Amino acid sequence: MRWNGGKSAVLILALALALPCSASADPARELDSTEGATSRITPGRAADMAQPIDLSIDSAQSRNYLLPALQIGAFQFLLNRFDNLFLGDDFAVSLRSIRRNLHSGWTTDNDSFVVNQIGHPYQGSIYYGLARSNGLPFWQSFGYAFAGSAVWEIAGETTRPSKNDQITTSIGGSFLGESLFRMSHLLLERGGGLAPAWRELGAAAISPPLGLNRYLGVAGAKAFESGQPATFVRYQAGASTTLNSNLGPSLERGDNEAALEFNLDYGLPGKNGYQYRRPFDYFSFQVRTANRSVESLTNRGLLVGSAYSAGERYRGIWGIYGSFDYLAPQVFRLSSTALSLGSTGQWRISPSLAMQGHASAGIGYTAMGTVRSSVPRDDRYGLAPQMLLALRMVLGNDASLDLVARKYLAGNLIRSSSDATDRVFRGEASITMRVKRNHLVSLKYITSRRDSTLFGPGAPTQRRDTIGVYYTYQPSDGFGIVGW
């Protein structure tokens, strides 16, 4: 599959921005706000539930195992014919090419980074979504995505099957597909003030497989009970300028950029009665576009875990998280599909001060490379440890401070025959202040750094630091704080 960076930015952001949902909490547990600079925290109000769409079909009775296989096969046939018509001989599949791929070893392909790390996961999300919207649960849908990816590698292209594509398409695609599937249902359930027809259209934009199967009347496309999770949504639009830039071997240069950003936290811990029984009952999704391309996309969900508490003021969840990260801050690029052990929690320090946070560490199949490199293409693949720490401090209903730190440590695990090492750090710090009701303003600092010995001893650090001002819209009060 071929993928254009600008088109991917427009598509993914459009899917995200089609979700006009608001934070959900128990309105009976809300705290009254007070006048002054340090008003009490008000948990987000319950979302609009007017004119609900029927989602009550029992999922176990509505599962269809044959139809998703047929739909995935039809999708692959149409995609192959399109690619062969417009992109050339790599898709001129024949019985001879299929037989050759069946008997050849799996390799690492050399498609563009955006194709491999954005296009293939999105293609995998289509496979996954077709199974999921036929009523199948997470792990069974993952099996369809894995099988669909293998079939494409062998019979969808004439090139040798690629192990990096198999991983990002099936695993990264399933993580992405589940988040999009739940976003679509969130819109269908809550509506955001939209009429049912517009909700159906928006849900189809977010998850095309779900939209298709709802249009076809497939029973499994209506069979999902969310449990009414607590959510937090934030939209941002603004501009940033470069404070510090060290290109290293990159030929890319861009001092200023316009950016759009969408954030969704789903299933935040603390809501009474909400349970974490299924993969991605909690997830965090963020996409940022800058200058018409995807600058970052991070998607993290709880695969297996449980809730816990500590006293009256702290609620949390812990377990194994699955994640897909994509970073492309102009000078270098990174992608990781990972499993991590971690925890997400909320601490109500006082009536006017609260803290939310996440910490995790794990290992991922990681790709690293340089944007418009002055040296021969340096994209590298392999396993790499990674860590994540995120913190949000909330001051009443007036302001929040967000801090995020990501670290990727790629050394000999990347390539056992090489002593080269790669170290990537991504840090974000932002303060958001309420101007009026749902309208806010944010000041955000982002630093992206890569230390690599791949280019020889003493090679310079690739680094880009930016600061920007953003208009911010939050559909609800409370900055995502959950009441209990």
Where are these regions (language model features)?
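Bacterial N-terminal signal peptides
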Residues: 9-20
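N-terminal targeting leaders of membrane proteins
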Residues: 20-118, 123-124, 132-134, 138, ...
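Alpha-helical transmembrane segments that form the membrane-embedded catalytic/substrate-binding core
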Residues: 123-124, 156-185
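Outer-membrane beta-barrel architecture
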Residues: 130, 261-265, 303-307, 340-346, ...
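Small-polar-interrupted transmembrane alpha-helices in polytopic inner-membrane proteins
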Residues: 137-158, 170-174
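Sequence/structural signature of outer-membrane beta-barrel proteins
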Residues: 152-161, 242-246, 287-294, 323-331, ...
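Residues that define the transmembrane beta-barrel architecture of outer-membrane proteins
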Residues: 172, 254-262, 295-301, 333-341, ...
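Outer-membrane beta-barrel "beta-signal"
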Residues: 433-435, 462-484
